[in-house]
Every structure is written in C-alpha cells, then in structure tokens.
Design a protein with these regions (language model features):
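Active-site-proximal alpha-helix that buttresses catalytic centers in soluble enzyme cores
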Residues: 2-9, 16-120, 171, 176
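Acidic, low-complexity terminal tails and accessory targeting/binding regions
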Residues: 2-23, 116-120, 131, 138-149, ...
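Beta-strand elements within well-structured catalytic alpha/beta cores of enzymes
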Residues: 23-27, 82, 210-220
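Active-site metal-binding loops of divalent metal-dependent hydrolases
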Residues: 30, 222, 274
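Phosphate-handling substructures
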Residues: 34, 97-186, 302
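Alpha-helix termini
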Residues: 64-76, 99-124, 184-211, 259-262
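Active-site signature of alpha/beta-hydrolase-fold catalytic machinery across serine-
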Residues: 95, 227, 231
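GST superfamily/GST-like fold recognition
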Residues: 222-226, 251
Length: 303
C-alpha cells in the first residue's frame, strides 16, 4: 500500500461494525502416527497416518472454490497462508494451498523450530505459503517421543545436542501470545488499508461478499491453537474443555476481526469446524457420537 493511496478512514466506514473487516482462520495439522499411538511429539515429527492422508485430500477438496471464490467452508481465498515449519503442519498447509491455487512452501525454505520468527510481510495478497517458527508446537525436551514419559519403539528421539532444551509452559504461552499479536496486528493493518481503499463513505463495500476482505490462515498445532485462544479469546473456554480447548486434526477455528476508528475486537465465528470430514475420519470421544459438522454461513453476515 503506497503512501499516495492513504486516506483518512471515515467513521461511517465502521457503521456496521458487526461485519468483520477481516478473517483469521487457525488450522490444526492432519493426524500423524504419533497421534494414533498416543506418543508425545512437539517439535519432533512422525509420518501422517492413513487417516491423516485422507484428511489432507478432504481438506484440499474443501478449500477448492465451488462458486465464485468461496468454497465448502464458505470462506474467501486466503490472502496469506503461514505454517509452522514442522512436517505435519507443512503438509497440511500444502493441501490448503493446492485447493486454493496458491504456491506451496518452497522446497528451498530452511525454516525449523529453532529458526528466528519470521517478520510479517507486506500488506497485500501473497501467492506462496510462508513458514514461521513461532507457530511451532511446544518443545517438550526429554519428554518428546515418549508415552507417559517412557520411550516408545519406533519413535527415536534426536540427540539432546540436536534437540535442545525444553520450553517451559510460561515461555510457550508467551511465544504463542507474541506471535499471535504479530499476526493479528498484521491483519488489522491490512483490514484498515482495505477499508481506506474502498473509497467514499457512500460506497457499498460493507455489502460486498466476504471474498473481498483480508483472510489470514495460520496452520499450527493443538497446543499452539489452545494457547492462542486462551489468551486472545478467553471466552472460547468451555467447561467441557477442562484445561485444554480441543481441536480435531485439520479442524478450523474461524475468527472475525472487527475494527473501529480506535479499537479492534476478535469474535469466534466457527469452532473446531470439521465439516470436510466424513464420519470415518472424524474421531469422536469414547462413548459419544461425533458432533455433526457446523453449518454457520459466513455470507449471512453480509446479507
């Protein structure tokens, strides 16, 4: 966005503040063999399970446009996709990118969990997935690749020198909070630029479909998504969650970003959305039937 394009944002641009100015979608990675075998893995990685591979295909199909530029999720094409550098998350981001017609993370990308966190890019649509080490799962140190702190055959832990030290709960939550703020700040700035560029106060930009607004997709892990939601959307916590906000593999949390001239607000629009998964790939809690997929229509916000 060049300086010549900047105009004061008229307060009338915010008259319908109930409509999000931008969307943020958090996606958990596909199921890995470690998930199946109940092996603790944070920064270590395991191959995807057969069900995880099927989830990726279903996720890719669900992101493919079905009408205009919307898809099964009734979401606009991402303006930017950012992924954790850990393999299971990268593969999940690739599925989303293929469905959306966006370039996957380049093979030349060398980002790992120990890399410096990436800087937020320019406020424009990006046609290639980016990696951010800040989206990595928590580092569990010597507990990596264990079940109840016991080694598990087939899950060899890298040498301590290579793996490094564990990340404390406090340090992990601070990282998730800081990285979350970075990306929400980026999205807010983009949303405000977008409102500026809509033109005069009597324009019909507020009535346009959601495919016209900025949409950031972050592909990460269960613990990271839990930490983000607890800190940025604490009302998301339900009694059934106990100490952890549950997220199924490849599920989506879609968040609306609302802006006024002096503030911003996040609103959870979709929670743990697995509408793309059929009953054979949507695991349910023991003794309970899986919840049916959500059918919230985001375009209703613009109707």
């Amino acid at each position: 966005m060049g300086e010549s394009k900047k105009r004061p944002i008229c307060s009338s641009h915010f008259m319908q503040e109930s409509r999000p100015a931008a969307l943020l979608t958090l996606v958990r990675h596909a199921e890995s063999m470690a998930n199946v075998d109940r092996v603790l893995q944070g920064v270590c990685d395991a191959p995807l399970s057969p069900r995880g591979l099927k989830q990726l295909q279903q996720l890719e199909d669900a992101w493919r446009p079905t009408s205009a530029s919307l898809n099964l999720f009734d979401l606009p094409k991402p303006t930017l996709i950012v992924t954790s550098p850990i393999g299971r998350a990268k593969r999940t981001s690739c599925a989303i990118a293929r469905g959306c017609g966006i370039n996957t993370l380049p093979e030349s990308d060398t980002t790992i969990f120990r890399s410096a966190h990436c800087e937020a890019p320019q406020h424009l649509a990006h046609d290639t997935v980016r990696a951010d080490a800040g989206l990595s799962e928590r580092h569990f140190g010597t507990a990596e690749c264990t079940r109840k702190m016991q080694p598990v055959q087939g899950y060899e832990r890298p040498p301590s020198k290579e793996l490094g030290r564990a990340e404390s709960v406090t340090a992990f939550y601070k990282r998730a909070a800081d990285v979350g703020v970075k990306w929400v700040d980026w999205l807010e700035t983009y949303a405000r630029h977008n409102l500026q560029d809509r033109g005069s106060p009597d324009s019909d930009h507020q009535n346009k479909a959601p495919d016209t607004i900025p949409h950031l997709v972050l592909v990460s892990h269960g613990q990271w998504i839990n930490a983000f939601l607890q800190q940025h959307l604490p009302d998301t916590w339900e009694k059934a969650d106990l100490y952890y906000i549950q997220s199924a593999n490849t599920s989506l949390f879609t968040i609306g970003l609302h802006v006024t001239p002096t503030s911003r607000r996040l609103e959870l629009l979709r929670r743990n959305d697995t509408r793309h998964l059929d009953e054979t790939t949507r695991p349910s809690k023991r003794g309970r039937r899986a919840k049916p997929p959500q059918r919230t229509t985001l375009t209703a916000l613009w109707s």
